[in-house]
Curated annotation (Swiss-Prot):
It comes from Rattus norvegicus. The gene is F2rl1. Coiled coil: none annotated. This is Proteinase-activated receptor 2. The chain crosses the membrane at residues 72-101, 109-137, 150-177, 184-211, 236-269, 278-317, 324-347. Belongs to the G-protein coupled receptor 1 family. Residues 1-25 form the signal peptide.
Amino acid sequence: MRSLSLAWLLGGITLLAASASCNRTVNAPGPNSKGRSLIGRLDTPPPITGKGAPVEPGFSVDEFSASVLTGKLTTVFLPVIYIIVFVIGLPSNGMALWVFFFRTKKKHPAVIYMANLALADLLSVIWFPLKISYHLHGNDWTYGDALCKVLIGFFYGNMYCSILFMTCLSVQRYWVIVNPMGHSRKRANIAVGVSLAIWLLIFLVTIPLYVMRQTIYIPALNITTCHDVLPEEVLVGDMFSYFLSLAIGVFLFPALLTASAYVLMIKTLRSSAMDEHSEKKRRRAIRLIITVLSMYFICFAPSNVLLVVHYFLIKSQRQSHVYALYLVALCLSTLNSCIDPFVYYFVSKDFRDQARNALLCRSVRTVKRMQISLTSNKFSRKSSSYSSSSTSVKTSY
């Protein structure tokens, strides 16, 4: 549990540092700032060049939005956290995916869901260098609108993909506890089907992010933002309905299902009769369940709640001061990509063994030889003890 404790400590440090950065950022504009959280307004109609091609229109932002885009919160704090997540998340999820696909022979439903969860985390983390570069260059996107769409689509898509696979994993764990005699192959086939359905669902729900324009040029700051500034009519209309639907359908319902599964799991474990050795395992399982459930809500709940609040404020009051906090919460949600591999390590004994063998550069053939040797040694000890006991019985007669 030490690794999970370190992850919690990292999350706490993130929150404290982010709170200080948010306070400095919000207070920068002064008391007269209207604070319309990254709403872009078209300055003038785009001029026409001599060739008849319109020049890219420029958008203006208010003082609060300018302070967020130029402040240390987005240009220093966020890239530092994303660098940490990238450095830890890329190798750990890559190794986890390799263990699940190439080192684990028995593809149980839990292994299938964890492999898909590792894949979702990996697909999210591999795009972080672009996001880090964007923030380090003062929130100036230089890679084109198409690549910005891909970055945003993968970022949000894989976040909600992780939520759904964690929900499937929690429901599957509860089902194994209440129905341990089920057919494993049938369960594995169901898990594969559910996984494919989740990937298809995530692709469909992220299509709007690939269709709409994500880059906005701001002449006053001489930067081109990626998703951080959008036209007011888009924020009030399409994006409000879109993200509200995502928050309810792809976060709220799975969160309630996950919480229910874990609560029922804890009740079932506590009510079951066990010996002293099994009691220790049960307590460890309950602690792990509480840790995973807390991680689930701490990583994903703040960003989804603040996102809904942000769009509600924009729609009702045409202003919002919570976008800076939302950026912090969204950054906090990426810590899940660092924590998940350690959760695999504590949840699955098979993953622990295979990961340890992989780190020690032991091939599958070497591991088999070690297992055969260990089994033969145990058998020889039992045989020798049986023969010695038989000899002692004969001599006594």
